[in-house]
Amino acid sequence: MTIYKDARNGRITEEMKKIAEVEGVDPEFVRRGLAAGRIVLLRNLKRADRVKTVAVGEGMLTKVNANIGTSNTLIDVNMEVEKAKIAKKYGADTVMDLSTGGNLDVIRRKIMEAAEPLPLGTVPIYQAFMDVATRKGAGLYMTEDDILNTIEKHLKDGVDFMTLHAALTRDLAAKAVKSDRAEPIVSRGGSILAAWMLEHGKENPLLSNFDYILEMFKEYDAVISLGDSLRPGALEDAHDEYHLSELMVNARLVKRAREAGVQVMLEGPGHVPLDRVVADVKLAKRLTEGAPYYILGPLVTDIAAGYDHIAGAIGGAIAAAHGADFLCYVTPAEHLNLPNPEQVREGVIAFRIAAHAADIVKYPDRAMKVDIEMGRCRGRLDWECMIRLSLDPDKAREIRNQYGPTSIKSCNMCGSLCVFLLLDKWRRKKDEELHAPLA
């Protein structure tokens, strides 16, 4: 029995009670959200006792994912393990292993161990393609069984959610490749599947075998994350016919997953102009009847190379404030290189800021308590309190101490002109005058 089926049957389980406790909502609210497919729980039954309770969807606090993993030109397992630990330390809710180089089974298991208790996601088509490339000399020799067996292997390992690019049809792939899009296909998984379909003249195996895949996910009660192969990789491609056509297919797949009793969420772009971010979220929610929306950024400009974590956090904050549920971080290395550990930290913090800013809008009673406390700490110049409440206490302390200790209670920005010190001095003076003895 999946948690979705339990919820549909009106049963409030211990896991639902735990979600309610973590999120600060009523268990019945959680049950109704799960039953409607508007909330998912990111945990594979194989790891149910080892994974933190992370629920995504309507009424849940906005979650942040950190992508890590090797490339086939830079294989440093120790660095990826360090990235997993950094993502966990600085507050990511989940980690995805996107490795494409090295022994992918070993790497996935090491990252899973390092990231625990965070849920782990993967994109199994990467391993299916790379393993066949290693064995046979070219990834396009992979068969449908290679893909399905890789998915099953990841499920058996305890992977909690997987991106499946099932909505990229053969027809859409052929049209996109010949289109005048700025960037026809920017999804790695999508490009692999497009090349495979065009080479073999067959339909997308993730789509043609979708019912079988649903049965596999149902057994482990893991979550399918429906990938968007034709997401816009440039602002000018946002919401074009290819992007929206794939979204329509994904909406139908959401319905099929729900009918099969499988938890499912939808992935979104990408690169979207600022004035279209809200419309993007509302459209996705409308077409999927409120499926949890997992969005990459979105980046609101294409020219922020080196600062794409900022461009993405701007879009992410707007998207989440208007209903996106799950933000996939972007690092400063986006579009330029494999991120290093420090860039992973910067990406996590940027998107935690975005998620928290959105939650203040969506759930002020739950989210704003810490901001209220921070304001009080600042008002009394309680530096230890300010640092403790910061999203990145290490960074806050580093900057606070960057010129060494100050001789006064304020900081070096204002010195003796600190607004709080000035007002405090004035108040004390007035108080002394008020209580001075009469002449």
Swiss-Prot record:
Pfam families: ThiC_Rad_SAM
InterPro entries reported in the protein's UniProt record: ThiC, ThiC/Bza_core_dom, ThiC/BzaA/B
GO biological process, one term: thiamine diphosphate biosynthetic process
Superkingdom per UniProt: Archaea
Residues holding substrate: 67, 96, 126, 165, 187-189, 228-231, 267, 294
Binding site for Zn(2+): 271, 335
Cofactor descriptive note: Binds 1 [4Fe-4S] cluster per subunit. The cluster is coordinated with 3 cysteines and an exchangeable S-adenosyl-L-methionine.
GO MF term (any one): carbon-carbon lyase activity
Natural source organism: Ignicoccus hospitalis (strain KIN4/I / DSM 18386 / JCM 14125)
Reaction catalysed by this enzyme: 5-amino-1-(5-phospho-beta-D-ribosyl)imidazole + S-adenosyl-L-methionine = 4-amino-2-methyl-5-(phosphooxymethyl)pyrimidine + CO + 5'-deoxyadenosine + formate + L-methionine + 3 H(+)
Coiled-coil intervals, chain numbering: none
EC number: 4.1.99.17
Binding site for [4Fe-4S] cluster: 411, 414, 418
Protein name as it appears in the record: Phosphomethylpyrimidine synthase
Gene behind this protein: thiC
EC class: lyase
Keyword list, A-Z: 4Fe-4S, Iron, Iron-sulfur, Lyase, Metal-binding, S-adenosyl-L-methionine, Thiamine biosynthesis, Zinc
Function per UniProt: Catalyzes the synthesis of the hydroxymethylpyrimidine phosphate (HMP-P) moiety of thiamine from aminoimidazole ribotide (AIR) in a radical S-adenosyl-L-methionine (SAM)-dependent reaction.
Family, similarity comment: Belongs to the ThiC family.
Cofactor: [4Fe-4S] cluster
Metabolic or biological pathway: Cofactor biosynthesis; thiamine diphosphate biosynthesis
